Amino acid sequence: MMFHSLGLLYLFLYVTLAEDCIDRPCVECRHYIKQDDPCLHHGTKPMLFCDPQTNLIQESSTNFLECVQNRWVLRECVTGTIYESGRGCVDPTIQPFMQGFSVSGSGRVGDVCQYNTDCLSGMYCATGLCSCLSTYILRESYCYEKVNPNQPGCTYDVQCEAVWPGSKCRMDSSIGTCRCPEETHVARETRDGWVCISLRDLSSGGTAPLYFVCALPEGAGFKISLNDPSPSMGAFPVGCTVGSSATIEPVQGLHGGGACMWPSDGEYIGDVYDCIHTSPHINLAEKFPQSNYAPTADGVCCPSRALACIQPQLTGPNPSEPRWWYNSVTGTCQQFMWDSGATEAKYHSPNNFKTIQHCESYCRDTCQRGSPQYSTESAVHSERPITSCAASVSCANDFQCTAIGSQHLCCPTPGSVCSAKGGRPYDIQPRTSIHHPGFMVYTGKESIRFYYDPGTGRCQDFVYKGAGGNYNNFLSKHECEMYCARLQCERGSPLRIGEEAQRCQNNAQCPSSHECKADQGVCCPRKQTICAQPLRIGDCTENVKRYWYNARTRQCQMFEYTGCQGNDNNFDSIMDCQNFCKNAIPEPKCIQGQAYKDMFGNFVTCSNGMGCPANYECYFDGSQWGCCPTKAFTCSLNTDSGIQCGAGSTFKYYYNPQTQNCESFQYNGCDGNSNNFANRDACESYCSVGGCPNGGTPLRDHSGMVMVCGAQQTSCPDSHECIPVLVGNSLINRCCPTRAYMCGLPPQQGTQCGANYVQRYYFNIVTSQCTSFQFGGCDGNANNFLNIQQCRNFCMSNACPAGNVAYVDPNSQMPINCNEALSNSCPSGYACTFNPLINNHVCCGATDSGVCPEAEKAFIDTIDMSPRECLINIEQSCPANYLCRFNMQKNKYYCCSSITGKTCPVGKFLYKDLRTSQPIRCTIGRNDQCPDGFTCQSYLANAFQGFCCTANSVCPDNADYLIDDQSQQPRACTQGTFVSCPNGYACRSLTSSADGFCCKSGTGALPPSVTDGCPPNEYVYLVQGEIAQCDPFNPPNAPCPSEFTCQWSLSNQRYQCCGSNPAPTPQRPSDGCPNAQIAFRDADAVRVCSAGAANCPAGYFCQFSSSNNQFQCCGVSGGCPEESVAFVGMSGEPEKCVVGQSNCPRGFACQKSLAGHHVCCTVRKVACESNEVIIEGECHAQVGPGSECLANEQCTGGSVCEDAKCECRPPLKAVGGFCQEEIQCSSNQVLHNGLCHNKAKLGEACLTVRQCQENSGCIEGSCECKKGFIEKAGKCMTPVEKKSAVSSKSINNGVTCSKPGWNPLIDEEHERPKHCSPIGKACPNGYECQINNRRTQYLCCAPDMSMSSTVSIPSLPPPSTTTTERIMTTKKANLKVCPTGRTPYLLNGAPQKCTISRCPAGYECTYRNNGYHCCSMANKPGLTVAGTTGSVVSKSTPSPDQEKCPRGNPLIYPSTSSPVLCQPGKRGCPVGFGCVQSSTSNNHICCPSRHSDRPGYQSESFGLGAYYSRGPPAAINPCEGYLVLVTRGVNGRIEKRCERSCPFPQIPIGGVCYELKNKAT
């Protein structure tokens, strides 16, 4: 029985603890209910589980536990419902547990909230959800206030148990009151509220009166009562008088007559020890007469709440019982194991609680350190903490109002605690030391504690005697520093140099991350610094719920703090975190240096490159934008040692712009500028030390010295190249890394030195593509780029010379591949270069980039594709062969170079240094920079810089000179020698000396031979490439042009025109090809081609045109006549030939050039027939699918030339000489002659009998009944069937009119009698509404005309009438469905019936000829069409001008002159027309679907000539669908056929192919 009772108690505690586990760490709550655990009564409980992501106990929303046969069984709610405690599975859409929108004051625990007012009393809004305040307890989604023992106001036991374990809510006083556990505890009153005193000794289990019992630890409280070791006390506990406030003993020699005092020296300790009634209540002097107790002594001195909560954790020698203690450092309650049977007092501490709720209520829900300010009452134990300081009461000195849960207490200030007072206003005992050593108790022991010395600002250690003292008493130095740091800084710890706080008098003595707190003289961290610190959970083993500010998300988040080694971004509550870090802007992480701050120390946020000051650029670090220093600014700054922060200093590196090297300097630890690098490599890599054009640093040897390379020095490895770099004012050859080496490095993640890893890109040599990777921010390598475009620019251009980049497609942003075998396959200024990294050719070069003069290119930075800037007053600021040019528009200097390599003015020679073979740059106007005979010159006017060039021209008339291959100097020669200069050059001199230079003998594009026969320095006059002859004796017959004279030529033995200047060459119109090249034209249009594809005629090559921005066919003129081009042989020159002896390639002929030579030129274009096309200069006939071919131009009908045969590409097939899709007709169509035609009704037009119905045929273009059949109700039937049908309709299963001899009106649409209503006129003329013979319905009835002799029979056409006239007359009769002068509404060419649907506006339902049809309204003004008789047009009917076909003209209804409307998918248009949407409206009209060349096409084809007409046939698209009409010559005759496309160079106009002719021709 006893075991069963204990089991019930254990199960009760088990369940009670489980309800409080939610949102607690998993290690703190292991005893929640699980599946298969025992249970007592049937019911349900929420299922709790440990969330592995948060490591917290959570409640399942869809699962729960049900007690079945004394075991908990796991259950699951049905889909769409959630489990709610006390209600079971509920539908959240009917009664939502989580409110989507908060209503003020209506939120329960867990409901969504925005403000505290959205939640009920006792709650606050935490992280968007309503939560209980710390002084309230959760119960069934509501918060109830915790109630102290012996206090009223409880509703549930949990309100009492949260304050003291085992307490219950009793209703013995008609109101719920919390009572201590009966029989085992008694209630005792203190200033902090009532406590429950245990009367049982846990170590022995006895219940004998112990008298001197304290509340804590429960079960061993009698072991911690104060005992003065003085012999006068006789080993009795220190007594007191309950309620007394006396600070001095009333009777000398006796003790316990007042408040708590230490007997040995009389020190008042009543503010740190509570005087509690003995248990049971006795008078100590009477109970213990041998003692020195005063007569009024009736209490025992026990540690106050504030003193108990800062005591250490004591476990005892054999810990076995789980208990909780309050960690004043972390502000949380933590579990430990305790030895309840330990007999010695040194193993017990008042900081010992049975439950976590008791621990939190006792220690957490009060002041952090020290006792609160109490009210003044007559009895001390009746005093209570002041809880309304924020509203009506102000706190006394040394106290500050602090919010704790739902209360506001006056708590000791950190300044009071961290001082000599130690948070004790009544510490009246004088002493010489700042710390209070306490006093030695009978059973206590000494220990080392720490106190804060406000004079030194440091925490010092002292020996604590074990009892008493004050609150400037900390268990560890860390705890002391954490608490008392608030005395110096509002938040965070002061900056320290070793153990001492760094002193300051103003902000200039603190780093920018801190500010000087003048009253304390220390550097405190700024809000920006604290809130930007990363999450640091510490290195200890505790699990404390704290909050930190996530600068990236700008939100406060919870984390588990381990208890030590954290940082300042650590807050006790989410409210503290939010209030302090509100609107804090995180620090952007720059590549180098610190982001820019405003005058208030806040980081400046920019966007889209805007908002940064000079020398700063807008940079995105992966999570935010900030202003970071530019590379040029960083590398130009002087060294800055920064500000002292912390102990010691270090050595860093900076870039010295004067020496252009990285040098070390001593750094004080904080601030400085961005020219600050951790090591030499980082400095050299960032500032590109050594001038390596591709970036990177020069190669160093094993000793760390930079290697020098060259012809006589060490050679560079394959990964580097020997390049002259600028060092100071001189050039030194150094080994610089190649771009291929840099792009071949593996991706290096590096080390994290920023807030987060950032995305970077590297070149993957396996895929030859740029790929992303995560970079830590430091210690990377050269294969690291900010974005994918930088990666492509740098690595795709690795084969290009320095300053040149690969030409990029503006659309794809990828380099364009070129063909090295094709000349000029790259844009102007670019050369086709092989890139081994991507195993392809790219176009390398550069343009002026909008910053360089015309015909010059800029030095392009391959990283960002930007032109390099330079400084005009700094030597060697541009690479070799580049000059510093000024751009007026941008007001900046840029490095520029000639695209063609031109350096000096025309006729001048460039001087090169004999040692480096590099040109000497100079400043124009200075005479001390060039050697003798050379001056500083430039081929550009008004230039600031140039090169050293010869002072005088090399050749006369500034002619070009020949450069010797060996000396790279102008070739010297002597006039009159046999061989001195090669062909095209002549030995000339500026002086009378015979020594001269080889100068070009002709200028411009004219060949050298044009000077033959004329005196020196004169040129012959040419006419169409031939030397023009003249007659000096008869000038009018053979004159010379002006500036030319007729002279005798000794070499040619004739008179010819000679002049000092060559005749101007007629300029050809620009066609986009390079100079001396001609574009191939198709019908006066330049032929466009594809690079690398053989789609240019013979003699032409596919080259890129910069002016036309396209690839086009260009050929070398070579002096060929007219528009022909020369054949270029293996030598790269036009192939020369001899007429009649040399064989030119196919398509070429040996012709005389303008220079007088004979070269292979393309033959002239031949005129081909209309059915032929030119292929490789020859005419070839056009052929259809299945025929042999040479090129696509030959193939017709939409076919293409594949494997020398015209073929149709799938899914098209050859049908009648055309490529068409396989025709699939719908169920209401038939296939005829390759076209789908709608099935026709009787009287409708047809082309084949298959369109007509049963028993009918296509007779002269119309479906008519065959011989022996007559038409009835749209069908062909025999006369017997007609009579039978009429009879059946009349009888209609025996239903007839009530009058004999009367027949009902039959609805032809539904083949049933027409019903009517006897009220009103519901039947047509000639009919009356009668009830049927069965007396069930009313029918429209009329007399049987077949029985009357007065019935008028319509007259038939005379026998002489032709069949066609008979058909047309019948159709006219069929269309006479409206009264005279009124027009029917046509739908798909037929009058619309109104037996089912309503008529459109302007028409009314009218009966005529046994049917109801929509007819135009009679006598409506404005509806009669002028010029027509009885023709009415609806106002809504579109006019021909309003409705238009996509091709051709619409089918017109003559009576209304309007297009015929149709409905797609229902009733189609006549044969030859299709129902398509108008191109000008949403209506569907009948448009032509095929072509006919016959005039009068409408009458013969459709049989509808009297009612349908068409516009001019020429305006109609002659072919169906996408086909066009092509005119060709076949076997000597002209044929017109429909094909897929027009032959080149014709274009389609209105569906017909025409060849546009040039007006000039």
From Swiss-Prot:
GO MF term set: serine-type endopeptidase inhibitor activity
Organism ancestry: Eukaryota, Metazoa, Ecdysozoa, Nematoda, Chromadorea
The protein's name in its UniProt record: Uncharacterized protein ZC84.1
Organism this protein belongs to: Caenorhabditis elegans
GO cellular component terms attached to this protein's record: extracellular region
Pfam entry (one): Lustrin_cystein
Keyword field: Disulfide bond, Protease inhibitor, Repeat, Secreted, Serine protease inhibitor, Signal
Cross-referenced Gene3D superfamilies: Pancreatic trypsin inhibitor Kunitz domain (4.10.410.10)
Taxonomic superkingdom: Eukaryota
UniProt-listed SUPFAM superfamilies: BPTI-like
Domain WR1: 365-412, 487-525, 588-629, 690-737, 798-845, 850-897, 902-950, 953-1000, 1012-1059, 1071-1115, 1118-1162, 1177-1209, 1223-1266, 1295-1342, 1376-1416, 1443-1488
Disulphide-bonded residues: C309-C363, C333-C359, C459-C480, C531-C581, C540-C564, C556-C577, C635-C687, C645-C670, C662-C683, C743-C795, C753-C778, C770-C791
